[in-house]
From Swiss-Prot:
EC id: 3.2.2.27
Catalytic residues in the record: D91 (proton acceptor)
UniProt-listed Pfam families: UDG
Function of the molecule: Excises uracil residues from the DNA which can arise as a result of misincorporation of dUMP residues by DNA polymerase or due to deamination of cytosine. Excises uracil residues from the DNA which can arise as a result of misincorporation of dUMP residues by DNA polymerase or deamination of cytosines. Therefore may reduce deleterious uracil incorporation into the viral genome, particularly in terminally differentiated cells which lack DNA repair enzymes.
Subcellular location as annotated: Host nucleus
Position of the signal peptide: none
Protein name, as recorded: Uracil-DNA glycosylase
InterPro entries: UDG_fam1 (IPR002043), Ura-DNA_Glyclase_AS (IPR018085), Uracil-DNA_glycosylase-like (IPR005122), Uracil-DNA_glycosylase-like_sf (IPR036895)
Superkingdom of this protein's organism: Viruses
Molecular function per GO: uracil DNA N-glycosylase activity
PROSITE patterns, alphabetized: U_DNA_GLYCOSYLASE (PS00130)
First-tier enzyme category under EC: hydrolase
Catalyzed chemical reaction(s): Hydrolyzes single-stranded DNA or mismatched double-stranded DNA and polynucleotides, releasing free uracil
């Protein structure tokens, strides 16, 4: 209730003051490369300004992760023209380890249970993969793996707490633009939230791989055994004559 009252009191009608691309990069903390690539329509810009304002309000009332400077690290580590694989998750870890990359943690933090299951699948299917001690996935991002959550912030200890703030305006637009403007990408959709994004992707131009979320709490289906990394590299080899190096330093 406190957050709702703050939003009503502080989020003004932004329709009369549209942002330039440079202003969008500053206000949304997105890289200039991604701002140019996304070409956000005016309506989405207005909605996203409201979302950013709501998150700023939430930070005044409770602990929100990741830190403001980390929310969109994905946009700085993985430029749009370098993307080869898109892994779509749900929202950040709510324990303070979130890094701005879906499933990844800050350097030096141990892998959470969900990421441990991802590493189990990698160890099963990728030659030479050694399970690292840290959950940092920055190396993947720099190689062209876009690690994208559908929701970019979360309240401490409350998974899914920011689903209602409108971050999907941005995450959906990222996926749609990549589908429209790039060719032969691999989209890995992990979990029910990620599956809702499938309609944004043109299957005639891209490979879409769906699986349950890697959380060990998922008791209905197994993530380990989905062969996503094998299938992704086979597709990349066909279209780019190269594969993704999934190994991470220990």
């Amino acid at each position: 209730m406190a957050l709702k009252q703050w939003m009503l009191a502080n989020i003004a009608d932004n329709k009369g003051s549209l942002l330039t691309p440079d202003e969008q990069a500053r206000v949304f903390c997105l890289s200039a490369d991604w701002i140019r690539f996304l070409s956000l329509p005016d309506h989405d810009t207005v909605l996203l300004r409201d979302t950013v304002a709501a998150v700023e309000g939430a930070r005044q009332l409770e602990m929100v992760y990741p830190a403001p400077e980390h929310v969109h690290r994905w946009s700085y580590l993985c430029p749009p023209e370098q993307v080869r694989v898109v892994i779509v998750g749900q929202d950040p870890y709510c324990d303070g380890s979130a890094s701005g990359l879906a499933f990844g943690t800050l350097a030096g933090r141990p892998p959470p249970p969900s990421l441990n299951n991802v590493f189990r699948e990698l160890a099963r299917t990728v030659d030479g993969f050694q399970r690292p001690a840290s959950g940092c996935l920055d190396a993947w991002a720099r190689r062209g793996v876009l690690l994208l959550n559908t929701v970019f912030t979360v309240v401490h200890g409350q998974p899914g707490s920011h689903r209602h703030l409108g971050w999907q305006t941005l995450s959906n637009h990222v996926i749609r633009r990549l589908s429209e403007r790039r060719e032969h990408l691999v989209f890995m959709l992990w979990g029910a939230d990620a599956h809702t994004c499938e309609y944004l992707i043109d299957r005639r131009r891209h490979l879409v791989l769906k699986s349950c979320h890697p959380s060990p709490r998922n008791t209905t289906r197994a993530f380990v055994g989905n062969d996503h990394f094998i299938l992704a590299n086979a597709y990349l080899d066909t279209h780019y004559r190269e594969t993704m190096d999934w190994r991470l330093c220990g």
